[in-house]
């Protein structure tokens, strides 16, 4: 019964311990950040400042393209203004104003002179009646003249004007079409710049990632070699005590051990710097502790590929070539835009205008308006060949852009062939490094056996260890070189994604 009770207690305790371990497991995993190549790439793309700039340029050029499209549409503008002048516009001169102002006096005097002989024949009461009528008529004519004088007054010292104007381009010599194509090309340039920056970011993050992996494996190798040297030094010291080995052998081993410690320090420092660079590219704090998935595996996973140079694929995919082609297209459209300056331009205009004072019913001190519709034609006549010279300069820029495009194609063709050659060369080096590893390990095993048996010298054992270390280091370099050569080929072909 006690035995059964003890078993139950033991089982319960085991469950508690297991539960505690399971609870601690997430904390342990969370403390150690393991990054894969894909996760490093994703973080680098998210945090790269230049990619952010490229994205913003895409948005800018998309808005500029939309702006260019509006040039096909009618433009509506509202205008308004006020003007004060110290003098008003006068339709009549001073003499004419004086004549109208004294019109009654002049006419009355003329009538009185003309009718005087006849009036003198009338009786006195009749003469008085005629004189009274002439005076009244003179006053009426004076009033009429004054009204005519005032009617011709413009009163333009305070002028108001306003209106709404609509303009619709009909033919602009192809300038609007060229401007829209330029906007489309600029949008393509922004996209191709983004693709180029993205590929450069991936290329650099891959290099930094595999550099860390390479140095980590070399650090493990240096630690292993240092352990071997320490063990060998211990064995030699024991043999010296037994009188089998000399002090010179012991000193040689000590020097090798010190060299191994120095090598380990160098590779550890290099690894720390490489991790800092990788963290910076990923947007992480440079002092953050990270572990890469490929550095904790037994071996570096290498997949060899056989490639044939495909220049056409590179020409179709490389964003650098697309950017140069964009430059060619841009200069061609700029030439068309300049040529449009020498062609006639036709626009429809229309709108509604108001003025105060207005002249639609004489001069009235109030707002009056009217509708209008018209055609505006602009025909260049002579500009001293200014446009002609600009067109020639733009055509020269097109020639330069075509030459740069052809030169870039030749260089990319060479780059693709070099990258393909490097991939094949890296595969061969990897095969030779693997073969050297087998020979070096067998040589080391034989040397160790001979040393233990006493018929192999310390120098021979150290040479075997050094050869083994060199072979292991060459294998790491060969494996990493295969990885980097494949990345370089993808970048050369424009397929790095």
Protein language model regions, located:
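Small/polar (Gly/Ser/Thr/Ala-rich) solvent-exposed segments
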Residues: 52, 76-90, 147-157, 167-196, ...
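Periplasmic alpha-helical coiled-coil/stalk elements that build and connect Gram-negative outer-membrane
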Residues: 3-9, 63-65, 192-313, 422, ...
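Bacterial Sec-dependent N-terminal signal peptides
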Residues: 1-38, 45, 497
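Bacterial Sec-pathway N-terminal export signals of envelope proteins
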Residues: 30-90, 286, 292-329, 409, ...
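Small/polar, glycine/serine/threonine/aspartate-rich low-complexity segments that form flexible
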Residues: 80-164, 295-304, 336, 349-379
């Amino acid at each position: 019964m006690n035995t059964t009770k003890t078993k139950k207690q033991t089982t319960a305790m085991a469950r508690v311990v297991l539960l505690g371990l399971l609870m601690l497991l997430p904390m342990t995993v969370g403390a150690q950040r393991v990054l894969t190549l894909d996760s490093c790439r994703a973080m680098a793309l998210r945090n790269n400042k230049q990619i952010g700039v490229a994205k913003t340029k895409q948005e800018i050029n998309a808005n500029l393209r939309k702006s260019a499209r509006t040039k096909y549409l009618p433009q509506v503008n509202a205008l308004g203004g006020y003007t004060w002048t110290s003098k008003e516009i006068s339709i009549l001169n001073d003499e004419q104003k004086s004549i109208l102002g004294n019109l009654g006096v002049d006419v009355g005097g003329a009538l009185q002179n003309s009718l005087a002989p006849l009036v003198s024949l009338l009786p006195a009461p009749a003469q008085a009646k005629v004189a009274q009528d002439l005076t009244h008529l003179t006053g009426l004519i004076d009033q009429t003249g004054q009204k005519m004088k005032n009617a011709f007054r413009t009163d333009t010292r305070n002028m108001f004007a306003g209106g709404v104007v609509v303009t619709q381009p009909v033919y602009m010599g192809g300038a609007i079409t060229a401007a829209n194509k330029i906007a489309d090309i600029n949008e393509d340039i922004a996209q191709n710049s983004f693709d180029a920056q993205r590929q450069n970011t991936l290329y650099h993050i891959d290099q930094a990632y595999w550099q860390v992996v390479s140095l980590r494996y070399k650090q493990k190798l240096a630690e292993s070699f240092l352990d071997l040297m320490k063990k060998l030094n211990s064995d030699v010291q024991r043999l010296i005590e037994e009188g089998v080995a000399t002090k010179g052998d012991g000193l040689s081993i000590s020097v090798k051990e010190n060299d191994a410690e120095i090598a380990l320090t160098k590779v550890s420092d290099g690894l720390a710097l490489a991790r800092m660079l990788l963290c910076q590219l990923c947007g992480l704090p440079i002092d953050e502790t990270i572990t890469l998935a490929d550095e904790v595996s037994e071996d570096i996973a290498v997949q060899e590929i056989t490639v044939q140079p495909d220049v056409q694929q590179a020409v179709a995919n490389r964003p650098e070539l697309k950017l140069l082609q964009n430059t060619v297209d841009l200069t061609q459209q700029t030439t068309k835009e300049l040529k449009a300056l020498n062609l006639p331009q036709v626009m429809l205009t229309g709108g509604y205008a108001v003025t105060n004072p207005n002249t639609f019913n004489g001069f009235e001190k109030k707002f009056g308006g009217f509708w209008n519709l018209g055609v505006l034609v602009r025909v260049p006549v002579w500009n001293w060949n200014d446009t002609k010279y600009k067109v020639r300069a733009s055509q020269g820029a097109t020639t330069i852009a075509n030459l740069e495009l052809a030169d870039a194609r030749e260089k990319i063709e060479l780059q693709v062939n070099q990258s393909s050659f490097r991939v094949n060369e890296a595969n061969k080096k990897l095969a030779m490094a693997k073969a050297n590893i087998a020979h070096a390990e067998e040589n080391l095993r034989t040397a160790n056996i001979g040393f233990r048996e006493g018929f192999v010298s310390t120098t021979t054992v150290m040479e075997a260890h050094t050869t083994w270390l060199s072979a292991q280091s060459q294998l790491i370099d060969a494996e990493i070189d295969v990885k980097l050569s494949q990345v370089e080929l993808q970048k050369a072909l424009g397929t790095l994604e």
